Amino acid sequence: VHVDAAFGGFAALSPEHAHLIAGWEMADSVTVDNHKWLNVPYDSACWFIREEHLPLQSATFQNSSAPYLGDPAADFNYLNVGPENSRRLRALPAWFSLHAYGRSGYEDIVTRCIKTAFLLGSALSEDPAFELLAEVKLNVVAFTLTDAAPERINALVQRLNDRGRYFLSPTTLFGRRGLRAAFVNWQ
């Protein structure tokens, strides 16, 4: 079983929301997108895999087809068990960010972002011009204009994004066009 914990993995840092990922430690593998909440470049992520699945990971991602890399089973090197091989060191920005903020710093960021999402969700539910497309559970709020054509929703996304203070993305959820606000800001 694989768990895609792109956003959800960070719920572990929030005592109030850690229950949302209960049982993830039983998964065979887990991915977490560092760029979602660690304030690092877009392509930074982690993939955690159980040790007993290392042969499968090696077979899937081994870069040993080049003779000069040798046999990954005989001479284990993390270089040979990831898809990137010789590309840039994406872990360094994540390490610096983790070192700078620490667990308590990220707990504050995650908790604040979740609270902000719940505040927005609450405000939107009370306004008859808006409708939530899904219950707010973490840091993402999916909503739409009540009885609005997709063109109006797209125009609202553009108008809000043109302000330059935040970025909302258009989305479609359960066949309905809407907006998506994902709170991940460290400020």
Positions of PLM-derived features:
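Catalytic PLP-binding core of fold-type I/II PLP enzymes
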Residues: V1-S14
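An acidic- and aromatic-residue-enriched active-site/binding cleft used to recognize and process polar
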Residues: A6-G8, H35, E52, L173
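Active-site C-terminal subdomain of aminotransferase-like
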Residues: L13, A22-P128
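Short amphipathic alpha-helical segments
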Residues: L92, K137-N139, R177-L179
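Conserved PLP-binding active-site segment of the aspartate aminotransferase-like
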Residues: L98, A142-A149, R165-Q187
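Generic non-transmembrane alpha-helical segments
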Residues: L119, A123-D127, A155-Y166
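Conserved PLP-binding catalytic core of the aspartate aminotransferase-like
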Residues: F130-L160
